Amino acid sequence: MSSYLEYVSCSSSGGVGGDVLSLAPKFCRSDARPVALQPAFPLGNGDGAFVSCLPLAAARPSPSPPAAPARPSVPPPAAPQYAQCTLEGAYEPGAAPAAAAGGADYGFLGSGPAYDFPGVLGRAADDGGSHVHYATSAVFSGGGSFLLSGQVDYAAFGEPGPFPACLKASADGHPGAFQTASPAPGTYPKSVSPASGLPAAFSTFEWMKVKRNASKKGKLAEYGAASPSSAIRTNFSTKQLTELEKEFHFNKYLTRARRIEIANCLHLNDTQVKIWFQNRRMKQKKREREGLLATAIPVAPLQLPLSGTTPTKFIKNPGSPSQSQEPS
């Protein structure tokens, strides 16, 4: 929502020439509480312009301005919480035609230290050098807040709000000056993030991000090594093991056709049967090696000759090669 100022010419109403600067109702509070604004200096002999803020319940500004508004003596508040703001209007006699023709420019002049933005967006008119300057900013009174930008009071929450854009458009369609005021470095208050005030105990540590039951292959993948998906161990049933052992008893090696047939009968896949036979052959070779070592250990002492005895001599009989005779 862009903020704007409504400029109404009242030179033909009531026979009193002048201009009226009013604020749209959307910039005011929801209740019908008027805001009294004090002009910075006398506004002339009745032919000058005056600055007013409409009541919040009014939809359109009053077409007839007062003849000569007197300067009210309003004492300033004792200790305002925020910086006060004044709406200043300056009008030089004889410049009413130029203002009505759209030759006057408007500008925002900041006065508060917190949310002010320096910059004068006023430019002298081409005819006679007459110009009008308006200084606006947020008005914070004791009873509530009066925001020209139409936004929420972000200062109360500790968060900065968006700056209003300065827009000027003349009533008769003549092009006007348009410029957006940007804050100077250092004048904008530092934003207070709610997450910045949290202690370090609420932050996420590195050990919280690591999986507790990470496998060794997963750890190798963290250091750059490729970790293939580990195969799940197959739990064979008793019937499956019996059939596989029976087939292994007859055939240590299976053809591909026989392997596929067994896999279909036992509700397994080809790879599971292949791996089982590989492991079974390795187990068989291991058992054979252990059996040879177990039989070779007790036979070795019997082959050594006994002390004090002569070795036995076998004499072959040509008639009966299988019989042997001992010497007498």
Swiss-Prot record:
The keyword Nucleus applies. Transmembrane segments: none annotated. InterPro entries: HD (IPR001356), HD_metazoa (IPR020479), Homeobox_CS (IPR017970), Homeodomain-like_sf (IPR009057), HXA1/B1/D1 (IPR046327). The keyword DNA-binding applies. Keywords: Developmental protein, DNA-binding, Homeobox, Nucleus, Transcription, Transcription regulation. Residues 319-328 have a biased composition (Polar residues). Residues 305-328 are annotated as: Disordered. One of its GO terms (cellular component) is nucleoplasm. A motif (Antp-type hexapeptide) lies at residues 204-209. Its main location: nucleus. Pfam families: Homeodomain (PF00046). Belongs to the Antp homeobox family. Labial subfamily. This is Homeobox protein Hox-D1. It comes from Homo sapiens. The lineage of its organism: Eukaryota, Metazoa, Chordata, Craniata, Vertebrata. The gene is HOXD1.
